[in-house]
Swiss-Prot record:
Alphabetic keyword roster: Endonuclease, Hydrolase, Nuclease, Restriction system
InterPro entries in alphabetical order: Restrct_endonuc_II_SfiI, Restrct_endonuc_II_SfiI_dom1, Restrct_endonuc_II_SfiI_dom2
Protein name stated in the entry: Type II restriction enzyme SfiI
Transmembrane segments: none
Organism whose genome encodes this protein: Streptomyces fimbriatus
Keyword Nuclease: yes
Catalytic activity: Endonucleolytic cleavage of DNA to give specific double-stranded fragments with terminal 5'-phosphates
One GO term of the biological process aspect: DNA restriction-modification system
Length: 269
């Protein structure tokens, strides 16, 4: 049984990321009723304040979803950061779980700063044909000193939670409608050759920033391209009219390699 993620095969590393994502999706599903109430009935003066609201809700959802913690801190520009032990079929692995919350009236992309990027990215600019690159800002692992003279790398796992909503006007007590919660798992740096081997095989695109104004460079992740590369890496928890909770659906691949969605059971918080 492994403790060093670098000893895992790429398939095993993918399964660790998939297991982590599945836990996050379960936690968000179980909190989705309260999340909708908080998100829709809390006043916010700007889109930036709505994002802060999404960050708080994500924290609330995940506070009961933790595994055995490791008493270390991870410094970084991510909303939710936890160093912990992760039980897996491949061993008990130290992990740095990184979860960042977004909120937008768009449902097709997320914008990341370099400090949130887990793997070196490259893509071809659709208008100019120029190849654009951005180095990863998230380290692949955090080295931990053991009590018995060993060193363990805690693998970083990057998850993004995207709150998709629309603004409401003249609706008493409600300021916006939360329509879906998207949950993305971006691949670890070791998986770059699987997901972004060249500029033309990429789910990345140009981010919105102004070099002339000295703004920090950003990069976009496109949902449809990520789902095409690996269906389970993009999950959607959708609110329907007949339930206070989101629909508990998990996207995956079947044995024939076709995309399927399956309903899962969940508990009330």
């Amino acid at each position: 049984m492994h403790q060093d993620y670098r000893e895992l095969s790429l398939d095993e590393l993918e399964s660790v990321e998939k297991q982590t994502l599945r836990t996050i999706v379960q936690a968000l599903q179980q909190y989705s009723k309260e999340a909708k109430s908080i998100f829709e009935t809390t006043a916010a003066d700007s889109s930036g304040e709505v994002i802060v609201l999404a960050e708080d809700i994500t924290q609330y959802a995940l506070e009961v979803a933790e595994t055995y913690p490791i008493n270390r801190r991870f410094a970084g520009f991510i909303d939710y950061k936890r160093v912990r032990w992760l039980p897996s079929p491949h061993g008990l692995l130290p992990q740095v779980l990184l979860v960042d919350a977004k909120a937008s009236t768009e449902k097709n992309r997320d914008t990341l700063q370099r400090s949130q990027l887990p793997m070196d990215a490259e893509f071809r600019n659709t208008s100019s044909g120029e190849v654009v690159t951005m180095e990863a800002g998230v380290i692949p692992h955090l080295m931990l000193q053991s009590a018995n003279d060993g060193v363990l790398p805690a693998v970083t796992t990057s998850i993004f939670v995207h709150f998709y909503y629309r603004e409401l006007k003249d609706v008493e007590g409600r300021y916006r409608e939360l329509k879906s919660i998207y949950v993305l798992s971006l691949p670890h740096a070791r998986l770059k050759q699987r997901y972004n081997p060249d500029p033309d095989t990429s789910f990345f695109g140009a981010g919105k920033h102004s070099p002339a104004r000295g703004e920090v460079a950003r990069i976009r992740v496109y949902f449809d391209r990520l789902k095409e590369a690996c269906p389970w890496r993009l999950q959607e928890l959708h609110y329907s009219a007949d339930s206070e909770y989101t629909q508990p659906r998990w996207r995956d691949l079947n044995d024939a390699g076709h995309e399927v969605t399956k309903e899962f059971l969940f508990l009330e918080r």
